[in-house]
Swiss-Prot record:
GO cellular component labels: cytosol
Organism lineage: Bacteria, Bacillati, Bacillota, Bacilli, Bacillales
Gene Ontology terms, MF aspect: IMP cyclohydrolase activity; phosphoribosylaminoimidazolecarboxamide formyltransferase activity
EC number: 2.1.2.3, 3.5.4.10
Gene name tied to this protein: purH
Record text about domains: The IMP cyclohydrolase activity resides in the N-terminal region.
Highest taxon listed in the record's lineage: Bacteria
GO BP annotation list: 'de novo' IMP biosynthetic process
Name this polypeptide is given: Bifunctional purine biosynthesis protein PurH
Family: Belongs to the PurH family.
Length: 511
């Protein structure tokens, strides 16, 4: 008896030559709808699904393959006589190959004009049912969900007349990953649609983007995955124009740099090392912004990652070229700028759209045995409940500097202190176990620039000692959440030294 293949694909890439090759191996093709028409137009003999089921396609094609004549042929275990007897009794032929991919749900919901009804209509029912049935019975059925695997199947058929058991098992595992990811995407879409914030089970899916040379350290293996429908203004969806492959640490640092530069509407440049900003600058032009970021810390920027929120022009490119950098991220590069920067063969150049709204995504952090999920910290200065508890209010110039410090400090590892003037950071104290320690580092880094600068803190001052330290350094204004039981101590110290202090009511811990 001829072997039989059920072929029903939304992605028709390579299906005609694959089906032709199956026919050459004495395989009968059974097909549905558009796939059947495409194969017939190519001159391939095809049996219609209705001829197998004895039942027409109904409900606008919603019911085609959901039939015992199909699923019996897929699930029968060929080594069991009672299964074969039941197939014979009901005139059901075994199906040996299933070549199916699913309705384009992901592509549909990615379209801006897609409606909820469009999404629902592109939820495949029959396809996953056939794939899962075939994958469950992979000892007897070869199941193919990805056109990439056509060549492997045909090679094994040509070499040995059948598909190896190990290959069938690998293809079955791929099917279950595929259908799980498909269902996860649907679940995520519908969960978002009904506004469910903390569902009883979390279904997310990621697609492999690339293998990485290694992880955080050379002895650790690592892979880069991306969300199929993640924000376009993200490192996962960035376009690499030049340079060697991104490393695990590059990706983390680039993501951190991008998060900070998104805070600014004016021309801004951000330099990052080990996921902390070492310099942030703003200006009238992107060249001025980068010059300020460089001036903020000309030592730590060496080997760093730069993110800019305007096109890189040739003058900025010439300045960037003179510094050893790992990555430059920007919305675009002028042709002249590319000519300058691509002369450095290892420098990675990434582009992505930065004119999008700053889309908040859930942050998922894995822990041993589980995961933590939280909203992204997108709380802006405009939403803060500003209070000024000191006698002196900030001047206009201090307000600008305070806003810059506050935007940056929430992206610094806690405990965090940032010193800034109106256009740049001048000192960053990151990742310290106590706030005074972070302040000391920021002040030491700022040097003479500390005098006349302002201070931003990611959390409240537990005691008044940080204000005393700020006063000694010549810092004129402070922005912090407030809320300590000893706030009065900090306020009194600020008043004593003529420092203006702003409470935001918002903490920005980052771990």
């Amino acid at each position: 008896m001829k072997r039989r293949a059920l072929v029903s694909v939304s992605n028709k890439e390579g299906i005609v030559p694959f089906a032709k090759a199956l026919v050459e191996h004495e395989v009968e093709i059974v097909s549905t709808g558009g796939t059947k028409r495409a194969l017939q137009e190519a001159g391939i003999p095809v049996t219609g699904i209705s001829d197998v089921t004895g039942f027409p396609e109904i409900l606008d094609g919603r019911v085609k393959t959901l039939h015992p004549n199909i699923h019996g042929g897929l699930l029968a275990m060929r080594e069991r006589d009672e299964h074969l007897a039941q197939l014979n009794e009901h005139h059901i032929r075994p199906i040996d190959f299933v070549v199916v991919n699913l309705y384009p749900f992901q592509q549909t919901i990615a379209k801006p004009e897609a409606t909820f009804a469009d999404a629902i209509e592109n939820i495949d029912i029959g396809g996953p049912s056939m794939l899962r049935a075939a994958a469950k019975n992979h000892q007897h059925v070869t199941v193919v969900v990805d056109p990439v695997d056509y060549e492997t199947v045909l090679k094994e058929l040509a070499d040995q007349g059948n598909v190896a058991t190990e290959t069938k098992r690998r293809l079955a595992a791929k099917v279950f990953r595929h259908t799980a990811a498909y269902d996860a995407m649907i679940a995520e879409y519908l969960t978002d649609a009904v506004g469910e914030e903390s569902p009883e089970s979390l279904t997310v899916t990621f697609e492999k983007k690339q293998d990485l040379r290694y992880g955080e350290n050379p002895h650790q293996k690592a892979t880069f995955y991306q969300k199929p429908l993640g924000a376009k203004a993200s490192i996962a969806h960035a376009k690499q124009l030049h340079g060697k492959e991104l490393s695990y640490n590059n990706i983390n640092d680039a993501d951190a740099a991008l998060s900070i530069v998104k805070e600014f509407k004016e021309p801004a440049a951000v330099a990052v090392k080990h996921m902390n900003p070492c310099g942030v600058g703003t200006g009238e032009t992107i060249k001025e912004a980068f010059d300020k970021a460089y001036e903020a810390d000309p030592v730590s920027i060496f080997g760093g990652i730069i993110a800019l929120n305007r096109e890189v022009d040739v003058e900025t490119a010439k300045t960037l070229k003179e510094i050893f950098l790992e990555i430059i991220i920007a919305p675009s590069f002028s042709e002249e700028a590319l000519d300058v920067l691509t002369s450095k063969k290892n420098l990675r150049l990434l582009t992505l759209p930065l004119n999008e709204e700053n889309q908040a995504e859930k942050r998922i952090t894995s822990i041993h045995g589980g995961a933590l999920v939280q909203e992204e910290d997108t709380y802006g200065f405009e939403e803060a409940e500003i209070k000024i508890p000191t006698k002196r209010e900030p001047t206009e110039a201090e307000w600008e500097a305070l806003k810059l410090a506050w935007r940056v400090v929430k992206h610094v590892k806690s405990n965090a202190i940032v010193l800034a003037d109106g256009q740049m950071t001048v000192g960053v104290g990151a990742g310290q176990m106590n706030r005074v320690g972070a302040a000391k580092i920021a002040i030491e880094q700022a040097g003479e620039k500390a005098a006349g600068s302002v201070m931003g803190s990611d959390a409240f001052f537990p005691m008044g000692d940080t204000v005393e330290l700020a006063a000694k350094a010549g810092i004129t204004a402070i922005i912090q959440p407030g809320g300590s039981i000893r706030d009065e101590e900090s306020i009194e110290n600020a008043d004593k030294h003529g420092i203006a202090m702003v409470f935001t009511g918002v903490r920005h811990f980052k771990h």
